[in-house]
Amino acid sequence: LLPNGESRTTSRDFADMVQSQIVGDLQMQFDSLWSRRSTWDRSYRESRTPSSPSMLLELLSHQNFADMKYGLDPSFRFAVSRAVYKGMLKYLSSRYGTAYVVQPLPVGSMGVSFSKDGNKAIISWKPACDPLEPTADPSGYILHTRVDDGAFDRGVKIKDIKRGNDRLYTEIDITPGHIYSFRVTAYNDGGRSFPSETISIGLPVTADLSEKILIVNNFDRVSAPAFVDTPIYAGFDNRIDSG
């Protein structure tokens, strides 16, 4: 029994809910044939002696090439980590009989530009919806600001949000002669998302607003290293793409 008198078989429910969440999410996002592997009931000290429900998770084998084609992909790792979090959350919801809300996904496609008079920065982003989890919709956004080499502030809830072209916008006053950096996080009753990428903007004291420069972040895609998979040999080739 657990210290509170509850049966340790609740750990079986815990493991089942986390595994079900992982398998379901991976089948939806990466491989519809992703198999559900065995759940063991073994006397491992790490999961047998804790004073709270516990489980051990072994998802991939570093000696399995098919596994590592996924395991080295950052987007796959994020999906698995989020699935573990959602499985834990749903277990706690079931155990205590309370509703749950999943934290939002990070916003994407961040952008910033000057207003026509140059006195404001126009910050824009695309909201991220989680098709696997309807409770993860954001209820609002928080703007974090840094001036020059200072630290980011603790964030301010954005009250004035405009919409257009599938994007959300807000404006903030800026002073020439300083560099402003911004991050946006989404929030709901389940918590805050991870922060967006950092975007920066600045206007010299003497500036010509008639000239414009467009800077595009073209490095927002992630992947595993390039691989070769033939009947003769298989493996990763970092010479082509290290991921």
PLM regions: where:
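A short, glycine/acidic-enriched catalytic loop
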Residues: L1-E6
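Active-site-adjacent substrate-binding region
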Residues: S7-W40
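Short S/T/G- and acidic-enriched coil/turn segments that sit immediately N-terminal to beta-strands
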Residues: G164-T170
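Beta-strand-rich modules
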Residues: T170-R192
